[in-house]
Amino acid sequence: MASRFPKFSQGLSQDPTTRRIWFGIATAHDFESHDDMTEERLYQKIFASHFGQLAIIFLWTSGNLFHVAWQGNFEAWGQDPLHVRPIAHAIWDPHFGQPAVEAFTRGGASGPVNIAYSGVYQWWYTIGLRTNQDLYNGALFLVILSSISLIAGWLHLQPKWKPKVSWFKNAESRLNHHLSGLFGVSSLAWTGHLVHVAIPESRGEHVRWDNFLTKLPHPEGLGPFFAGQWNIYAQNVDSSNHAFGTSQGAGTAILTFIGGFHPQTQSLWLTDIAHHHLAIAVVFIIAGHMYRTNFGIGHSIKEILETHTPPGGRLGRGHKGLYDTINNSLHFQLGLALASLGVITSLVAQHMYSLPPYAFLAQDFTTQAALYTHHQYIAGFIMTGAFAHGAIFFIRDYNPEQNKDNVLARMLEHKEAIISHLSWASLFLGFHTLGLYVHNDVMLAFGTPEKQILIEPIFAQWIQSAHGKALYGFDVLLSSTNNPAFNAGQSIWLPGWLDAINNNSNSLFLTIGPGDFLVHHAIALGLHTTTLILVKGALDARGSKLMPDKKEFGYSFPCDGPGRGGTCDISAWDAFYLAVFWMLNTIGWVTFYWHWKHITLWQGNAAQFNESSTYLMGWLRDYLWLNSSQLINGYNPFGMNSLSVWAWMFLFGHLVWATGFMFLISWRGYWQELIETLAWAHERTPLANLVRWKDKPVALSIVQARLVGLAHFSVGYIFTYAAFLIASTSGKFG
């Protein structure tokens, strides 16, 4: 009996119903709840699993390199990045016969292929890779790293190599190692690669293992470094007519502060990027020497926190007790890490298009759209996860005794004020924004567009002007020619910035108007509402006004309607579940806005966005409906085209999304009855009744059904929009 799944829970493995399987899957990664789990084993299991995670990442990136080298057209693309379409991989078995083979044979390939919209071609080209052999070398190196990671994971589960809990809880050593070792040294190594390999390659000089010790990255070598004349490395930059990948118009500078974009590739200057990574390396290597470990010098985080009591007693005992609370709670640490990573991922989305780091990325519109959307969705899921683990921290790890009257306890004590303020902000944003959209919609419908309420975003325009955008005529800071900052900028720092910000061919500080003002506030509504649900779920996780003592209920009990006095106010899991819908909703608005604004910009008809984005029908008709026309046309009576796969995915995405509602809007008793009817019929049907099962079938629990519904809703929603985004963009721009 002991061998039944799940092995980690005796109680669950003896459950006679199908609940055993579902609960087993649900709690497989909740190591804390497993039988015989000690704190030490918990830390060791998580530590070892990190190596498995790394192995998967290395294997996946290796696969990207390998398939492009084997089936792609990297070398041909490098000869003409603007006109050759990059191939991701071949399609072995294109369905629907000869028309499909013809539709998907493109990019100079001999058979059907998929086009790459991930930006890897641009990235590899920028960092100095040029041949398929380079790609194969990279793939092999990553497979070796992957194997080493797997071995390391296995090794750290062996008795001799298992770290002790005290090692995991040594915060200072870990910070030093992560700051100096991981961030600092890896940034320094990346600077080295850019200076020794990528920058020479961008100037037509091929540096590889056979010559990298003999080719100087700078004609002066290390002389200026030791002489303290570092400015020599910034002299003689690439000229504005530099042809990327050749010596034509190339300079010799390696660390610069030019600002703006390389005129041909429309991407940041490689020498600026190298300079940036060197600065990061210096800062982080210094930061990683700040904390006290074996030598008795440096900061102790615990001492800093204990001493940090704000003046005037306004925050009670300040940060006392926080060190142990955080250091002993994996959920708190995970929550902090996810919050940071979520913000960083969203910043990647924002900067990837506005300051494109890779050569020719800015001219590959579909890839830009795909990268923006991808990173925003990832950010949304990571951020909601931060609050989920924050809530679990309050239920499982928070000790009121240890945190008496410190900042954490005071957060809980005035949670009503926090929640009501967020609620007020959400209501204000929601009613006013919707009110403006609906008013404008009605005015358009009644044929009086001049009666719309159109608000210019003057504060945002002022901020753009302060950064140097001259269009609005504000004449302030960098947009004022008399300003000292303006004059310094011409020569000392970032001389290319003002050209870039006032050039309409890039996405830096896009011109904004009333449509942007409205959608900005719609997005603000989404962000505040998502935050409200998440913050309330976490702050009310242990107890709320309706149910002050819910700690023992755990994290994932359901809100199950009006029974027991109404429990919808009190489940932390339910708050997370509702917040994910709002998160998806918000990111929908964000990506719709980004995409529509950009396709009108790229097509040279920005007026369409400006005029149609101020009322609801404009969004529905001129963005969604108009841009889905090619998609719905992937198959037609005349055969098929290369968008057909996206047309199919668009339909399939809607199907998956709609299936979600079957689980979301359902009554558990109905399912139980249906299951028992099916089981009864099965047992009485000849032949079918030869197959028996041991577990009694029971309906999913409320929480499980919600999770399954949410998963279908999310996956279907993302599939549908991904297909729409890629097809509508690639259909227009090839």
Swiss-Prot record:
One of its GO terms (molecular function) is magnesium ion binding. Chlorophyll a B1 binds at H654. Gene3D superfamilies: Photosystem I PsaA/PsaB (1.20.1130.10). Its EC number is 1.97.1.12. Phylloquinone binds at W671. GO terms for biological process: photosynthesis. Pfam families: PsaA_PsaB. It is found in: Plastid, Chloroplast thylakoid membrane. It comes from the Eukaryota. SUPFAM superfamilies: Photosystem I subunits PsaA/PsaB. One of its GO terms (cellular component) is photosystem I. PANTHER family: OUTER MEMBRANE PROTEIN, OMPA-RELATED, PHOTOSYSTEM I P700 CHLOROPHYLL A APOPROTEIN A1-RELATED. The PsaA/B heterodimer binds the P700 chlorophyll special pair and subsequent electron acceptors. PSI consists of a core antenna complex that captures photons, and an electron transfer chain that converts photonic excitation into a charge separation. The eukaryotic PSI reaction center is composed of at least 11 subunits. This is Photosystem I P700 chlorophyll a apoprotein A2. The lineage of its organism: Eukaryota, Viridiplantae, Streptophyta, Embryophyta, Marchantiophyta. The gene is psaB.
